[in-house]
Each structure stands twice: as C-alpha cells, then as structure tokens.
Amino acid sequence: MKSSLHIIFIFFSILKINSQIIGNVSDDLDNKLEYATVVLFEQNSNNQIGGVITNIDGDFKFNNIKDGNYYITASFLGYKTKKISEIKIMDNILIDLGNIILEIGNNLDEVVITAQRSTIINKIDRQIYKSEMFKSARGSSVKDLIRQLPSVNINSLGEVSVRGSKGFSILLNGNPIQGAMSTILDQLPSNAVESIEFITAPSAKFDPDGKAGLINILTKKGAIQGAYGQINLKSGFPSIEKYGNDKNHNRFGSDFTYNITNEKWNISLGGSVLRNDLGGRREGEVSTIIDDVYNNFPSSGERSFDEINFNGRFTIEYSPKSYENLSLGFFAGKRSKKRLADIVYYDNYRISPVGSNNKTQYISYFNHNLRERKGDFILGNLNYSYTLNNKSILNFSLLYEYTLLGGPTINQNLGYPDNSILYQDEYNTNDNPLFGLRTQLDYSFDVNKNTKLDLGYQYRDLDHTGDFVYQRRYNFNDPFYLVPEFSSEVNLKRKIHSFFSQFSTQKDNLSYSAGLRIESMKRDLLLKDKANTIDESLQYNFTKLYPSASIQYVLNDETKIKLAYSKRIERTTTFKMNPFPEREHTETLEQGDPNLKPEFIDQIEIGFEKKLNNNNRLFSTLYFRNTKNVVNRVNTVYNDSVLNRIYSNVGNSKTIGVEIGADINKSKKWKSFVGGNIYNYDLKGSFDNRPISSNSIIYSLNLNSTYRFWDDASLQFTFNYLSDRITAQGEDSRYYNPNLTLEKTFLDNRLKITLQWLNIDLGLLKSNEQRITTFRKDEFYTTTNYIYEVDIIMLNLSYIFKNGKNKSKFIESEFGKREF
C-alpha cells in the first residue's frame, strides 16, 4: 500500500509545471535528522541555486527546478557533509534521492582520522548529549551520567537540580516516568544509555510535570538484524580514607543485555546488580532559644550509606507489518538504601536567661540513627502503534505499576562512652504501597509536506496508601509501645484527565510550533491518626490550560536562533503532604503540609548556536522562570533540642539566568566540552507569619576534557562545581568533584577496560564536601558539614560477546520512583 501511494505521489508530482527533488536525511543509526541543511548547486558553475532544512521526519524538497545538471550537499552539525552528484533535471521530472545517510566526523581520502561525535546536538526544543562522551560514568548509574550536563548539579545529599531547580521529570525512550528522580537515576545502568535529551521548554504533547523541564533517557538501539550481547563488571578498590566508620564499604556491580532482532521480532533481556556504598562523616551544631533559654549541642560522627539495587527487565516487540508494531514489557526490582548516622553529641549546655553567664552543662550522649528506604516493585506496559494509509500514526499505551515503599527508621539515644546505657529507643515504620495506572491514545498526521498535527488523550490514576507506626521504649528489656500522636494512616488518590493538540510546521529556514494541553485533576488526601483525634478527607481539584510555543530560525549553515515558552506544574508528593511528624534523627522531626499546593511555572527562553572553525561549536540560552506557590523545606523549633522540618508553600520566585556551552577541538586527539550556568534567584513570600526574602546569584560549571593517546586508548578529566547557594532560611556552601578516567579497548573494541579515580582530593582539596546552614533570628541556628568519601578507585570491564547491534528497549517506573 505504501509503495502504491508513493507511485501515485510521484505520478501527480510529474504533472506539475516544474521539476522537483525530494529526499530524506538520517544518521548512521537510522535516526532522522531534523534541521539538517541541504543545498542545491549547479553542476558546472558550482553556483548555489537554493537551500532548505529538513523537517521533523528528515524530509526535504526543492521545487520549480529548471532543466540542467545539479548536485546537492547534505550536512548536520557534528556529521560529515555528503555530496550527491550527477542529478539531471529535464521534462518536468521528480527526482527521489531516497535516504541520505550522514556519518560522524570528517574523513579525507587516504587519510585516517579518528572521528568523534559532537558532545551536544541542539534542536528546536532540546539538547542531545551522547553518553559515550562521559567516561567517568562508565559502569555506574545514569545519575553519574547526567551530572556532566550543563546546568545539572548533584549536591552532597544526592539531590539533582536542573538550572537550580530540583523539580524536573524523567522520560525513558520518550515515555514519562513519575517517581523519585534519585531512584530512576540510580537504578538504570549508564552502560545501557545511548544518549540523554534535555528538554527545557516541552511542547503540549508532553506531560506538564517538572518545573525545570524534562530529561529524556534514550537506551541503546540499532538497526542491524542478528544477536547482540554485552556484559559489564564493576569493582571498587578498598577505601583509602576510613572516616572512622564502623565497617568497610563495598562497591561492585554487574549488568548485562541480550538482544535478538529480525524483520518482525525484537526481544530484549537485561538485568543488573549494583552495590554502591559510600563512607563519610558529619560535623554539626544546633542551637535553639525557647522561653528565654539558649540551648547548644555540637555533634560529630559517622554518616555513611549502604546501597544495593537488583533489577530484571524483559521486552518483546513484534512488527507483523511495516505499518504495525506491538510491544510488551516487564520490569521488576528491589532497592535498599541505608543511611547510618552514629553521632556523638558533646559539650552540650544551656544558658538561662539568654545573655547571662548562667551556664549549665548537659551530659554527652551517643545517637545511633539508621534510616532504611526500600523499594520493591513490578510493572508492565503495553504499546501499540499503527500507521494508516495516509501515513498518519495512531498510538496506544498502557502502563500499570505496583510498588511497595517503606523501610524502618531506628533512633537510639545511648550513653557515651558507655553505649550500653539506653536513654530512648524509637522505631518507626512507613510501609506505603503504591498502585499506578497510565493510559494514553494519540493521533499524528501530516497536514501537508511541512506541517504536522498531534492530538491526544491521557488518563493517570494514582492510589498511594501509607501506614505509619511510631514506637518507643526506654529499656532494652521492655517491649515497644505505640506513640499515637506520631502514628497515622495516609491515603492519596489522584486522577488526571488530559487532552492535548500540537501544531508544528516549517517553511524554508523557519520552524515553529504551538500547542495547548488542558488538564483536569482531582486529588483526595485521607488522613487518620491512631489517637482517634483526626479522621478527615481533604480535596484539591482544578482544571488548567498549559500552552506552549517555540520558533527556530536558521540564519545560515553555521548559525541558528530559537525562542520558546512553556507552562509547567510541579506536583506535590505524598511524603510532602503527610502532616504527621516522622523522626528523621535525634535533632530533627520531619512533616508535610496536607494543604500543600502544586507549583505553577511559566518559562521563556532564547537560544543561540554557532558553528565555528575546526568543528568547534558554541551555544547559549537565556531563560526566565516565574514560579507560584514555591515549596521549600523550612524549620521551626519543636522543643529545646529538636527542630521541626516542614514542607510549605512559602511564596513566589523569579529566576533569570544564562546557560553557556562549547565544544572545543584543540587537536585531532584533544577534545573538550565545557558548560556553565549562572542565574539570579529571587524569592518573596512568608512562612509562619514572618516574611521571607532572599536574593542571590548562583553559578555552576561542568568540564569534560578527553585526550586520545591512540585510537583505542584515552584519558578523560571531568570537573563539576556548584557555587554557594542562598536558601529560604540559610545557605548551602559550594560543592565540587574532580574525576579522572583511563580507558583502553582490546579485541577489535569488543573488550573495554576503564580505570576511574573519582572525587579526587589527595588531602589537598575539599572535594565531595558541603556545609548546609539554616537559621531564624532569636529562635534557632543549625549548621552541618557533610564530608563524604574521596579518592575512590574503580575498575570497570565491558565485553561484547555477540557483536550485532543493540536494539534493546526497556520500560521504567511511572509512579513509585517519585515517592522513594
């Protein structure tokens, strides 16, 4: 049928008055190249007749061509220009050049040059980064991969931020994922990733979740039939610095992928295990003022992490016809992350009244705090795609997830130095199973050769129940008893209906799109304590529009500019709405706000990209973000020695910044990528009937520099830096990490060995260390310096035992990972 339509199209095209040339441009991995430049020249004179850029499907067309002999060139940033010669036009003919494949790098006749892909590819709505460029993340997780991107930072607590915002959404192969970002980023092996797309101003066909935009993780795939198998091993050397930790920390892992592909079937099987412990310590001080009494308790001790992940993945894809595709996938896994804080509180004292010399000394004590977070899950998805006769595409997808979240927290205050003395023993659980359903139907068709329209409907259902039991005792020989005021049942039900339309078109060097998404959300939060004093249901419902628009203009082969707008939402998690306190550790209770509103965001950005000599490139993006109902974690005084950490809507914020990146090729062997972000953050609002006002300039820098000794050996240095940052109630200090990676391949690139030196310090720097301070005048002051393990040595081995092309596609969690 498609062949018949193509013949009919050619027939009617011939009836036109003038001749045409049509074709399609893709890369060597069969990815269609949007915005590739195609130029038409007269054969004899080499005069340029005209130029066009490809549309979203890589198609191009030249109209009204006079009779004569011509040739064309097709080019795209980071790829070798390709020339098609001896194109003869006569008698109002249509010439179909078919698929033009561009290869990376540059090759000269009889000269061998090691070609490298550009680190970044800019498109109208996204930046694309190739994972192979970031060797320091080899054998690790996706989290270590994305920290190399401009404007992406990870602080000492493992929190990921994009352009200064911790709110963003994750896509896997274009499929949205709702869940704790740290979980998805820790679970997926970096070896399975082909590239990462940074979508800062998403269109209406994407979910509006995530105030900083979307990060789309694309797993490796290929187009060659056959079998592909790869296994990766990872092992860590013993820790150089012990930090006084009670036991040794282990780091090891393995992951594998096996893929079989033929004309109709694509079957993938994968699994991984990763143990990723981290040693460290913390030094802190807390002071409070309550009832004219000043209390002070400094502390010091171990803060370490034991983390282990297991998962297995299976996907089967069936294409009975070229226009029909059906896929079914399953994903199951277990995750456990234990945070141990064994802290000595020493030199504790109080002064009463405040400002006097009446100082009373407290006893010193030892706090053993073990907080474990578990996440056992299983999910499945079904996808169906059908291409109609008019080349329009109908897609249907269904995803269901069950996740059991939980893990106890143990908090013991013991004697010091005699730890056999028990002052208080607390044990609280937070088992909270989650059920998620997502279904989507969308339809895409071409209005004409250069115009496309997308329409769709989506339904999401979340049922998240929690049973939180808080127990206490004062003697090891006594049983625990229930603390009813801290024990509760919390149930969140959320239903979302969404409709969207997206219009995109292209004319000559100008491309633009506009879209609108309408969303109706219903949220029910059921709260019940075990003291039988609270039993209520809180509702929050709304219907809202999310418009988006983008425009890009290609000035010439080297320069393009773009402008984009997007309206977003950052939804609140169940954890942040749970109003019942949870004992995080001896000096902190943590609780949420049941009336917490989502954040609503308007973002606009202007981008510029310039191709320079020697394949060097420069890009820059100026952005502005306005956020309503900003959610911050703020502190109040609970009692003389405990602070209450609360999540609350504290006001509105404005962020204006600029993001800059550059591909720098110093020589054929030395290539660097540098990216930076600087922005001004202004927050105005109030909390607890007190005004909040903070304004600061924050910047970050990511550097990646690679030197190739030979075609099969290279050395890479990376450096990630985050400046001081003003918060709603204090300041986070600077945070940085340098890394060095040596890589060597053998056996015709089938065996790859990587030696990594992570968090370089040598006792000379303050790598992997950050101080976090919060205060409220005349009420409290707290500062904690987190010092984590440095000079970590890792060895990775990767072996391809079936040398076909990897076409694996796996699914990921949609709901549970946001709550982990």
Question: Where are the predicted features?
Answer:
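N-terminal periplasmic accessory domains that precede
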Residues: L94-I100, V142-L145, T183-I184, F198, ...
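Surface-exposed extracellular loop regions of Gram-negative outer-membrane beta-barrel proteins
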Residues: K522-D524, D557-Q603, F624-R645, R725, ...
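Outer membrane beta-barrel strand-and-loop segments of large Gram-negative receptors
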Residues: G436-R438, Y481-S487, Q591-D593, K597, ...
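Short acidic/polar hinge/loop motifs at secondary-structure boundaries
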Residues: V142, Q148, N175-K205
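Short, acidic Ser/Thr/Gly-rich low-complexity loop/linker segments typical of extracellular
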Residues: Q43-D59
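Short, acidic, small-residue-rich periplasmic hinge/interaction motif at the N-terminus
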Residues: T37-F41, S75-L77, L94-K135, N155-L157, ...
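C-terminal beta-signal and adjacent terminal beta-strands/loops
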Residues: T627-K628, K744-F820
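Extracytoplasmic beta-strand/coil segments of soluble accessory domains associated
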Residues: K143-I177, F206, G213
